[in-house]
Amino acid sequence: MLNTLTILRRVNQRPLISVLKRTFVQSRIIRNESVSKKPILTQLEIARSKFSPEELEAARLAREAGLGWMKKLPTKWVPYLELMRLEKPVGTWLLLLPCYWAITMASYSIAAPLWVTAKAIGLFSIGALVMRGAGCTINDIWDRNLDNQVARTMERPITSGRVSVPQAVAWLGVQCFAGLAVLLSLPFECFYLGALSLPFVAAYPLFKRFTYYPQAMLSICFSWGCLLGFPAVGAPLNLWVAVPLFISNWIWCLTYDTIYAHQDKNFDKFAGIKSTALAWGDKTKPILKGLTVAQGGFYAVAGIMNSMGPGFYIAGAYAIARIYNQVLKVDLNNEKSCWSAFTSNIRTGFIFWYGILFDYILLLLGFI
């Protein structure tokens, strides 16, 4: 009798157990379906969610407004040209002008014919455009997860998703090949001196992650033309001239790029991006004043060692005064003021060059 009851209980429990099992499985399926229906945000969407719709729209409009002549080009081309910063030629000029100084000073030192100087200036102009573009592309590849945390840079091609990293790397290869073609058109000394600069160009974007002085590395890259200018016209590399000229330009670059960095300092604090703007803070202006005086001293040494004429010193003194006045007047807490001061350095760089060019022309005409 007991055995019969036990068997009946087990039989009655089996349907209950199977029902419970089915219910459990169905609940798991429903739960998984509900989880899978939740939207999966990309890293780009997560980053952009930190900004208000108004900030995102303002960044987009600012980017489109700055395209200028590039708006007339095919839409597919534009992001790649933006990687080169073709819509912002300030950096290209600031890279190129020290090359002009060195080329013209080297031509002055050996009384090189005008066509030799013009040829070198033409090749360096193409090279600076291409290699500055390559440097910006490298910077955007490294910084794609930092640029999306700063309002001014979140619309850059890689950060905004308009260009993928593999596409950017391929475009970098094209630019490097074009830069190599320019180098091969110059004397061999320019080739190996130019190749020595590549590690600095590649390493610069990493410096803002672990040091407050990435501007020091960038200044090395932007001063390298002071070394290349001499062999470009067939002159021996006179280190007594090239080194003080290099240091003078290094200081100048450190000055204007620190002013530039003050534009983003509030965003940089939260993004973990380091710069001299954050390192120096309220002491920035006194430091930049001292650096500008030192810049003038090294520039004068370069002129003395190259036996330059009056144009070099008159124009140089005026240019240094402009930089000092720029440091005095710039409002480091105002983005527009910082940008205006930064871009004014193009005119300052040309003033330096006009003084050197004046002496060179006087030499060719036989007045020096």
Q: Each predicted region: which residue ranges?
A:
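Intramembrane alpha-helical segments
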Residues: 77, 81-82, 134, 153-244, ...
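Multi-pass membrane catalytic core of lipid/isoprenoid biosynthesis enzymes
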Residues: 123-126, 144-194, 270-312
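Core segments of transmembrane alpha-helices
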Residues: 92-99, 171-178, 218-227, 288-300, ...
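Membrane-embedded alpha-helical segments that form the functional core of polytopic membrane enzymes
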Residues: 96-142, 152, 173-183, 191-202, ...
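N-terminal mitochondrial targeting presequence
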Residues: 1-64
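Extended hydrophobic alpha-helices typical of membrane-associated regions
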Residues: 73-78, 301-368
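Helix-loop junctions at the membrane-solvent interface of multi-pass transporters
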Residues: 104-105, 184-186, 207, 231-232, ...
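Cytosolic, membrane-interface loops and tails of multi-pass inner-membrane proteins
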Residues: 52-80, 136-163, 257-281, 329-337
